[in-house]
Amino acid sequence: MCGQDFDFGGRDDGRVEEAACSVKNTNPREREQLLDEFGFGAIRRLSDDFNDMEANEMLCELYRMQVRRVVTDPHTAEGLLPYDYPLGCKRIAFDTDYYETFNQNAVTLVDLRREALETITPRGAKTEKADYEFDCLVYATG
């Protein structure tokens, strides 16, 4: 099992248990075990340097699997998944309970890939599909 935890700058965080491994050298069962044990941290335990697009897509799929595990609504989860860019090209939300937030009743994902934003209104926002009223607007640009 992959034991080293590192950040995307490649620096060791001091918790080396065994050498990190390439996602391409793991099988689906091992990747599931990594998710079971480390959640989003599983991706940090794989040493792929993001120059290999095949390995990057495997990491993206691992990330997608974990988002689907955390976000209880499948439609919302799909709106949060990286499909159109390699993992690491946009900020990755690992440790902030970001994805858990979407399970709260008062939180709604407005996926601008699915419905275009028309305007910000005094009480919220209007998209091509709906009007949304809210107290707080979070712009997440990646």
Indicate where each model-derived feature is located.
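N-terminal FAD-binding dinucleotide-binding subdomain shared by FAD-dependent oxidases/monooxygenases
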Residues: 1-142
